[in-house]
């Protein structure tokens, strides 16, 4: 499959949670699909559904592929890295392909004018179809009504992409956010009661830009603890599950239906350079019914 000028995955903007719906034919295994593409921070960003025995030719440039569901056969990659580990998603072959399985993937291509350092949120404004639905706001603007931890902090979030199947069931929500130097995006464990506006999910993060190369995910015993295990992440890397898993490698649930996580968070890195250097991250909040097993 060659990349089209215009995508053929239908989109809509009527989701009560905001953002863009992408309506994928995940059960129609005979037909591959591709979304429109968006630009953000000099990165070309696009989603693809690959039917079995499909081949996707990648654009010219430096390419990174995040597998959301299924498997890419030629690069031996599925959705999840081993638990609490970090791996690169860079793809050096000119193509990716499926075997007997399908694959739902996100593709990031660094363009020639992609800045090495992202130091202004204006650089990250989305360009592309219905990009007004992907507006950035600060964490404080979004969460300040019930949380004061982000007041004065240089961190931002945009509405993202809801990847839906034929029945409009959400397979994954892709949530873009940005973290400035030294910012702690709060210690949390996703234990709140799930609801239609905040469903349960199995989460992994994909790094689109690493400001200082020292920021990353951390584990800790409780909020406020000084003891943390940090997992630094750089451009194009993703991490494996932080959530608890059963003997089959599937998510463990709390009594309220939320996926069970230990305390964790994202810590923005630090360096001696002047000015800001943002970490740019996409959180993949995957429907537990669609996440693969990971022992």
Residue spans for each PLM region:
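A short hydrophobic beta-strand segment most commonly corresponding to one strand
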Residues: 100-123, 129, 205, 240, ...
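Short, conserved beta-strand element in jelly-roll/cupin
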Residues: 62-74, 198-220
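Hydrophobic beta-strand residues in large extracellular and virion-surface proteins
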Residues: 56, 65-70, 105-106, 174
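Short acidic-glycine-tyrosine-enriched beta hairpin
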Residues: 47-50, 69-99, 219-269
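Flexible, charged surface loops at secondary-structure boundaries
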Residues: 57-61, 98-101
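Short, conserved, surface-exposed binding loops centered on an aromatic residue
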Residues: 163-168, 196-198, 266-267, 273
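Conserved short histidine dyad/triad with adjacent acidic residue
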Residues: 41-59, 175-200, 217-223, 240-247, ...
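A short, N-terminal "cap"/entry segment at the start of jelly-roll beta-barrel domains
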Residues: 1-52, 90-93, 99-176
């Amino acid at each position: 499959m060659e990349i089209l000028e215009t995508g053929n995955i239908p989109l809509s903007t009527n989701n009560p949670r905001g953002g863009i719906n992408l309506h994928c034919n995940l059960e129609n295994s005979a037909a591959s699909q591709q979304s429109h593409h968006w630009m953000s921070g000099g990165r070309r960003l696009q989603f693809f559904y690959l039917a079995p025995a499909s081949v996707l030719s990648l654009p010219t440039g430096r390419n990174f592929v995040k597998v959301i569901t299924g498997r890419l056969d030629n690069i031996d990659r599925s959705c999840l890295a081993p638990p609490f580990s970090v791996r690169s998603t860079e793809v050096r072959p000119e193509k990716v392909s499926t075997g007997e399985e399908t694959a739902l993937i996100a593709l990031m291509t660094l363009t020639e004018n992609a800045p090495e350092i992202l130091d202004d949120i204006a650089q990250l404004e989305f360009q592309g179809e219905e990009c007004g639905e992907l507006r950035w706001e600060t964490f404080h603007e979004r969460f300040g009504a019930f949380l004061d931890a982000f007041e004065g902090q240089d961190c931002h979030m945009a509405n993202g992409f809801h990847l839906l199947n034929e029945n409009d069931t959400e397979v994954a929500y892709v949530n873009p956010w940005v973290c400035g130097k030294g910012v702690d995006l709060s210690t949390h464990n996703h234990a709140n009661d799930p609801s239609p506006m905040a469903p349960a999910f199995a989460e992994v993060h994909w790094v689109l830009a690493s400001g200082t190369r020292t920021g990353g995910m951390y584990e800790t015993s409780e909020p406020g603890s000084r003891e943390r295990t940090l997992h630094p992440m750089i451009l194009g890397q993703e991490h494996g599950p932080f959530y608890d898993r059963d003997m089959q490698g599937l998510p463990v649930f709390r009594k309220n239906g939320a996926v069970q996580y230990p305390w964790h968070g994202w810590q923005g890195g630090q360096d001696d350079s002047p000015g800001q250097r943002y970490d740019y991250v996409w959180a993949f909040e995957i429907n537990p019914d669609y996440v693969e097993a990971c022992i």
